[in-house]
Amino acid sequence: MSQGLIETTTIVETRELGHQIHASLLEQLKLQQEELLQQQRDLFFQEQQLQQQANHPVSNNGNTWSFTQGLVIGQISVIFIIIVFVKFFVFADSSSHIPTKPGLDGATGVIVKRNKKKQHLNGQFANDDGNEDDISLNSNESKISSILEKTYYDVNNHASESLDWFNVLVAQTISQLRSEALLKDNIYHSLNNFLTNAKLPDFIDTINLTEIDIGDDFPIFSNCRIKYGEDLKRLEAKIDVDLSDTLTLGIATKLLLNQPRPLTAVLPVSLTVSIVRFSGCLTVSLINTKDIDLKNFNKASNMNGYSKENGSADSASDNDEDEDDGGTALMFSFSPDYRLEFIVKSLIGSRAKLQDVPKISSLIENQLRTWFIERCVEPRFQVVRLPSLWPRTKNTREPVIKKTPTTSTTINGTSAATVTTPGEFVNSNI
């Protein structure tokens, strides 16, 4: 029994060992099969790669070139975007902002124009009627009403104003002119040269100056008021002027009788003319020399035959003014009720002298009054062109302060230096 059990156990153990050995062999076979399959797969993949390399030998170079090309294209696109941004967002378009015509086209968007409604109405009125004179008058009236409204000035109810400050400025100007005229006898030399170079008739000898008095008083302006001129449709300043002074000019000449032979007789003549009083109402206004009203007024004056003799003498200056491009001018005239008083002294003859002949005095006075009326008395007026008031570098001035030489003083045994400059005060407390 025991032997049989031993044999059975031995058989069982051998079977189990056989099963284990069989299982291990099976596992080893599976592992070997898997390794073989893996090797076959690797060999298959290697063969495929070798075939691909053989069929496409330049594939790597193509991939490398496509990357470089993409990089270059990307850089170019970035540069193009930067250029477009700088051109359209940083810098302005020159063609859209710089006007082709340097005239009014470039200033239309810069200058602020007010009263657009009035301008539109004026333009519509011009298209309907085409009357430039009416357009100018309407525009001038609108400007005048705007000026009076913004300056709070009522031409009908505003009180007259004194011109004390203006009198001081005029007095300073006249005083400076007198000083310059009397400096080195400038006025004498100027008048003497004028009389010497003047064309005289054959019966008048050389004219010599005997007396010159430019006065020492000043005109007084007062009672200034602004009025609306009905004739020229503009604002005018009415100013009362009063001058009580003595302005004298004395000359001496000879009347020559050249018949029947030259210098048959000689008659000495001495004249002294003095203006002792002038008063009147002065009308002053600022105008544009290209105004239509002014041109029409000049044409009317010429048609009326005003000052034919004087017009020929003044034609050169008138032509010069007509050739100008216009500008601001000061227009002034005096009312017909002015007051002008003269004192005329005459002395005729060599031995038997005739003194203060009334006929000669009235003749000279009438000639002077006629000369004044034809130039300055309404409806005639004088136009004085004003210089440009725009600030310029060439007109800029600056006071120059010059230092005087240094002077030394001794006080209580100590020396002190003092430097003085014009317009400064020297400190005396050393």
From Swiss-Prot:
One of its GO terms (molecular function) is lipid binding. Coiled coil: none annotated. Keywords: Endoplasmic reticulum, Lipid transport, Lipid-binding, Membrane, Transmembrane, Transmembrane helix, Transport. The chain crosses the membrane at residues 71-91. Its main location: endoplasmic reticulum. Residues 1-70 are lumenal. Residues 159-387 form the SMP-LTD domain. GO terms for cellular component: endoplasmic reticulum membrane; ERMES complex. Homodimer. Component of the ER-mitochondria encounter structure (ERMES) or MDM complex, composed of MMM1, MDM10, MDM12 and MDM34. A MMM1 homodimer associates with one molecule of MDM12 on each side in a pairwise head-to-tail manner, and the SMP-LTD domains of MMM1 and MDM12 generate a continuous hydrophobic tunnel for phospholipid trafficking. Belongs to the MMM1 family. Component of the ERMES/MDM complex, which serves as a molecular tether to connect the endoplasmic reticulum (ER) and mitochondria. Components of this complex are involved in the control of mitochondrial shape and protein biogenesis, and function in nonvesicular lipid trafficking between the ER and mitochondria. The MDM12-MMM1 subcomplex functions in the major beta-barrel assembly pathway that is responsible for biogenesis of all outer membrane beta-barrel proteins, and acts in a late step after the SAM complex. PANTHER family: SMP-LTD DOMAIN-CONTAINING PROTEIN, TEX2 PROTEIN-RELATED. This is Maintenance of mitochondrial morphology protein 1. It comes from Candida dubliniensis (strain CD36 / ATCC MYA-646 / CBS 7987 / NCPF 3949 / NRRL Y-17841) (Yeast). The lineage of its organism: Eukaryota, Fungi, Dikarya, Ascomycota, Saccharomycotina. The gene is MMM1.
